[in-house]
Every structure is written in structure tokens, then in C-alpha cells.
Amino acid sequence: MARIIYKEGLEGRNRLECVEGIEIDLLNGQRALIYPRYSNEELLDPKDRDRWLDAGISVMRALRLRDNQAATAALLKAGSPAARFATKFTSKKFGRFGLPTLLAAMEITEQEGEIDKLAREIDGADLLEDFSSYVWSCSRSKRDYGWIASGFYGYAYGCGLYHRYVAAPLVLLDTAADARLRF
């Protein structure tokens, strides 16, 4: 079930600057916080593909990924427009946003209606329905492809890095909490 997470002391104020984001549950038991600002971006310009040092992984490995921060950082280092967009958002409480894991991207497309219903209550928030129905993940499938979630068809597949699909800023909450405990 999706819900709005407010910044401390700003509960009930439905302006973008007063919210941490919209929380959703993932199939694997994790929770994710989505910042309701989106942009259709290339994952990576083909000329920069060799700068992305992450190896391609299978769809199963991409679905099992439980941390998006390292993969987003690798994309950012390679010059990814999608990663650059997602990481410009931060939260004092939850840290830096990144691109979603493949499972989180699939949940975003699956829960689009619930997410948009809450986003309509927040002044300044974007609606997913106004963007491409394909959401980038932070995982590479092959040399020239990244994993995306398709909202039209309800499945994941590898797609060319140069396509402009939704960059959805997201923090995996359980991962963010684990990282705070280690320091």
C-alpha cells in the first residue's frame, strides 16, 4: 500500500518541499521511497557505454538486487543522464535517491495508479501517467542494453541505453537503514 511520508514537523502539508516521498512495498519485503519528480532520460549515451563498468546481468540477478546505490553510482560515473537526474534529489533522513532496482521499477509500473493518486494531493509533484510507461532500472542487461520495466505489458526486458524512459528517483528504505547502522 502506498503512502505519503512527510518531513519531520511538516505532517499534513501537501507541498513537494514538505514530503520525503511516496512509500511503496516491494514483492521481496523491502520498502521503497519514490520522490515524485520524473524525467524521460537516456540511461546512457552509446558513446559512454564503455565507461559503464558494470557487467550485464540476467533478469533473475537484476530482480534479486537489494541495493540500488552502487549501481546508480557506477552509472553516474559513466555519465548517465538518468542517474544524474535521480541523484539530484536527497533526503536528510533517507539519503541520496538513485535509480530503482528492476523489482522496484516493476512495482512502480504496477502501483502507478496508487502512486499517482497520492501525488495528486502534493502540490508540485509529477504524475507517472504523464511520462513514458517504461521505467529504467539501475541494472545492465548486455553491452548496449539496460533492464526496464514495462507498464504496458507488465514485464521486464533489456532495452537500448539510448532510449528515453522514466528516471524515477528512489531510495530503498531497508537498505538506507542498514547503511546508517553500519556507520
Locations of regions flagged by a protein language model:
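An exposed tryptophan-centered "aromatic clamp" motif
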Residues: 79-98, 102-158, 173
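Extracellular carbohydrate recognition
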Residues: 159-163
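Extracellular adhesion/carbohydrate-recognition regions
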Residues: 1-93, 164-170, 176-183
